[in-house]
Amino acid sequence: YADGLNIPTGMEVGHGVVYVGQGTELLELRDRDGDGVADERKILLSGFGNGDSHQTINSFVWSPDGELWFCQGDGIQSRVETPHGISSLYQAGVYRLRPGNLRLDGLLDDFMGPGNPWGVAFDDFGQSLVADGAGGISYLTPASIPAKRRLRLPRIGQPGGYCGIECIGAANLPKEMQGEFIVGDYKRNRVSRLAISEDGAGFK
């Protein structure tokens, strides 16, 4: 479909295009003639950090309300020029993009949450969790509004090294698994299930 990419670490399909994160850029690839090869390659946004090539923007996923969310790992500092001004994210965090107007919000700036996020998932009610390659799972929804006061998000469940997270909602899987999360646990070389329960205003 597309060649000549430079260490792409994130990809998602939507609106008739493929969004790709590579190095400092967010690309939009489009196949105009339906031959399975991208005819157009457009840089939507640039200025994402590349201080560590395996922690650049990654893990693209659509939210239930049509926003594109993706992560940025430790050792990365981004200053992205958008039509709405500069969007900055210092160190590890999560981005929320509205593709229609290119509004980009940086969330969890400067270690408010996971130290190396690799994956965001939403449950049936739109609640979001983020997987951390350096520590565990965090409840992300409280950080959905960019904050000036930095508070660290609490962890959910056991610490681990996670890469990728998804909420189970497939009819071909057992009923008792529906609504649970699956995570890739690279430190233990396995895929794990995570069942969460309410804990005050958050989850455990």
Segments (PLM) and residue ranges:
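Beta-propeller blade termini and top-face loops
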Residues: 1-204
